[in-house]
C-alpha cells in the first residue's frame, strides 16, 4: 500500500484507541459519582476504629511477672523492663516498665505473646506531641485509661469506688 494511506490508518486506529481509553476512564468516574464521600473532618469528627485496631498499648503493672517475653518478640527490642530478683521468694519483682512510642511500630507482638495478658491495645491513636521525649511512656502513663473510658458513665474507676473514697476519708457518692 501507499505509505500515506498506512499513515492515515495508523492515525485512525490510534484515535479510536484513545477514544476508548477516555470512555473507559469516564465510565469509571461516573460509577463513583453516587457514592458518599469518605473524607472525615479530623479535629471535629473522630475516626471510628475497627475492632482489631492497634493503638496505644495499655499496661497493667500488677499482672506483669517480668518474664521479658515482650522484649524478646519485639522486632526492635523496644520495651524496657527493669526488675530485681527477690531471693527470699525466688521471683522477679518489676521495678520499671517503659515503651517509647516514637520508635514503636505497633506490630502487636508484645500483646499477642504476653503470658499474663498484662498488655493490651487501646483505640487511642492521638499520640502527637511537640517533643519526642514525651512519647516515652513509663508504667504509670501506660496504665492510664484513655479519656473515652474515663468519660464513660457506665464504667466506675477504682479511684471513684465507694471503698477507696471511704479509705481517703471522703463520703461515698450516692447517685439516685
Curated annotation (Swiss-Prot):
InterPro entries: 4Fe4S_Fe-S-bd, 4Fe4S_Fe_S_CS, NADH_quinone_OxRdtase_chainI, NDHI
Needed co-factor(s): [4Fe-4S] cluster
Pfam family membership, one: Fer4_9
Biological process according to GO: photosynthesis, light reaction
One Gene Ontology CC term in the entry: chloroplast thylakoid membrane
Cofactor note: Binds 2 [4Fe-4S] clusters per subunit.
EC number, UniProt record: 7.1.1.-
Top EC class, one word: translocase
Gene3D superfamilies on file: 3.30.70.3270
Principal subcellular localisation of the protein: plastid
Keyword Cell membrane: no
Name of the featured protein: NAD(P)H-quinone oxidoreductase subunit I, chloroplastic
Organism field: Populus alba
Lineage, opening ranks: Eukaryota, Viridiplantae, Streptophyta, Embryophyta, Tracheophyta
Gene designation per UniProt: ndhI
